Amino acid sequence: MGKRKPIPSINIGNNLNKKLKFSKQDSDQQQQQQQEQQPQQPQQPIIKYKSKREKEIHEKIDKIKSERKFIYKNAERHVKLSLEYAGLALSLPAVLKDLHRALEKFDALESSLIAELESLKIPVKNASTIPVLHPPINHVNTSIATTAAASINNNNNNDNTITTTTTTTTISNDNLASTTNSLPVNSVPRTTATLSDVNSLITATLGPTTAPTIGSSATTGDTTAIDGTNTNVTTDTTTIETTMKKKGRPPLFKEIPENCYVCGVTETPYWRRGTDEGVMVDLCNACGLRYMKLEKKERLLKQKNSTSNVLN
């Protein structure tokens, strides 16, 4: 028998160290390339606040700016949806009106915070360059201010006393009587108006003697005089009442929702429902349509995954 050849020894430790070194170098090079490709973001300067209240005010202002950006994005989304779906164009003015109210509240809050900072003599951050949709509101009437200043100067020159004069418009009793008399005489409640309309229809069809009025109790003498025609009158009144009733589908909501769960809109032509982590939430028409699209995509993806698993 021949001698066995010796197996060459392999130094596993050195080979592993080499592989780890090469892999580490490759990862470092990849990170450097990614950093070079990405644009360097400017570092925000660290602001030292003088007091706790100053920090709270600046944080509130930043939050208002972020909320305002969200409102502008929401308005843009509603406009795009109204262009895609013609039915949503009717509700667009109401949606924009709600967003305008929210922007006015944010503007008032931001102006009060900036005024507080100015009173504390604290430098305010640079204002945002977001365009404002609504026109500025002039709270001061210059003509009133100038006339008031002129009257104060005249009074100071005369007796060094300030006198204030107020002009009020009063309505006399004759004017009130004329306005009350100008109201229509036939303005009656809705229930009585409908009953009178039904009675006029009955008198036109059956005659004034045989047609009893609805809502009034008939005496025994009237019932004996009418005898056999009462059956026809009752059938006519029931048919008129049934035709007056509006036939419509039952409402989806027992109570009208206050606002949309996603965008916070309070007015919409049609309210919808959705789920958020198993909880039912109220959605406006635009958000509800978007939710239905996303739900349909997820359902199709689940079906594709299930069919591929079965075939495999």
Curated annotation (Swiss-Prot):
GO terms for biological process: negative regulation of transcription by RNA polymerase II; positive regulation of transcription by RNA polymerase II. It comes from the Eukaryota. Residues 1-45, 213-232 are annotated as: Disordered. This is GATA zinc finger domain-containing protein 20. The gene is gtaT. One of its GO terms (molecular function) is RNA polymerase II cis-regulatory region sequence-specific DNA binding. InterPro entries: Znf_GATA (IPR000679), Znf_NHR/GATA (IPR013088). The lineage of its organism: Eukaryota, Amoebozoa, Evosea, Eumycetozoa, Dictyostelia. A zinc finger (GATA-type) spans 260-287.
